[in-house]
Amino acid sequence: MLSIAVMCLNTTSKAQENADSKYTRNSIYMMKLDMAPENEEYKHAFEVMNKTFDGIDFAKRYERYNDFSLGNRHIDWTTIPEVTAAEMDAIEKESKKDQLLKSELEKLGVKVDPISEREYAARILKYFNENKYANQLVAKWHLSEGADPKNVTGWDEKLSVIMNLGLKGLSEEERANAIATENILQVCGDAENKLLSTTYVCVNNYRMMTAQEKTATAIALAQVALQFMPGPAKIAGQAAVTAAQVAAEKTKGYFVKTNAYLFKLDWDQSKFDGFYNNYWNKPDAFNTSANYQLKYVGKSSKSAGAGMTMKAAKVDELTARGALRATDAAFAALQRNYEEFRPMCSLHVEDGKLIAYIGKKESIKAGDKFNVFIPEEGKDKTIKWKQVGTIKVDKNGVWDNSEGAGQTIDGAAEDADDKDEVNTALKYTVFADKPSKKIGEGCMIRLAK
């Protein structure tokens, strides 16, 4: 990732640097759910996955987000509270598709997790809210760097964290004037609401699965989808089932599966007003009375190959690579599935082509469309983003920037689904459109709907 960052800096124009520097990023707190392995065969793999997760520098790996960690990144499953059926329904009601999928998996010989995805999400959410995670996130935004968000003794009157991450359009002089004239709350208001309302927590649950479990799941999903398709679409649906069955014959080994659950801070103007009316001058009251909440956004599930066997010579390296690839894929799926979570990234021009430093790691595919934006400064000095066009990823233009791209490791699992069309000669992703007066350096892009 460091080499990519350096390359970006070396090829970025002054105009582009200015655009990127004005972009207010979403904030993410990445966490891991610690659970016991399904069987003893996976015990060592779980240790490798845990070590791999702890070694991730999320500020670099997901550089288009603010790394907004509260410190501890682990949740012990044995400390997670139980939930009622009503609490699960509040997250997501069980559908006929869910029931059919469970039935199809059992028919195919797959051991179904007795804990449903909606139960995982509901229990994690209850854990967060019972342990005041939202309070800690709110506090972290308003405290000096390094202060304890669990025990607030006083707020940072300069609102340094919000100023640094949310007011990128202000000059140093304008920042100084805001502090000197005690006009900080007025200056920071809009930025504060945007930053806090786009503060997310992502919890990753890692499991191991065999090729048979992986392919059976794909077949079952295709079969369930087929049952809900209208007449004209059933031909395509049956083709999807057949494709999954064919892929099953070519998929071998063991895989890392990552289920990612996304939550966000529940924040709006009324929460902003309540914070300053009730707690700004009474930090002790915040410790005893504040009851901010996280809310559930959604989930994703992705897998990546590990070893052909669990005793391969390089099984640790293969498992670590699989964990990183699955983490990236699940994170990218959350972006694709939930528009509010999608980041912007810089658009560049190289050899007369529009390019961006995103690729397979971000699950970019040929034909993907991106909206193009330019920054505009409002009267209040806040930055607004104006859409000026749409561009499309070229047919042979996807860069393979996945973990360990181009590196062959002996003993790797075989994954028939890992057939994304990438151009191994590229060092960036190329768009089919050409630069124009409106679209080029100085623009930002975001995945379109």
Residue ranges and their predicted role:
Residues 1, 15-16:
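Initiator methionine at the very start of the polypeptide chain
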Residues 1-8:
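Bacterial N-terminal signal peptides
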Residues 9-15:
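Sec/Tat signal peptide C-region and signal peptidase I cleavage site
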Residues 16-449:
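Surface-exposed, polar/charged interaction patches used for macromolecular assembly or partner binding
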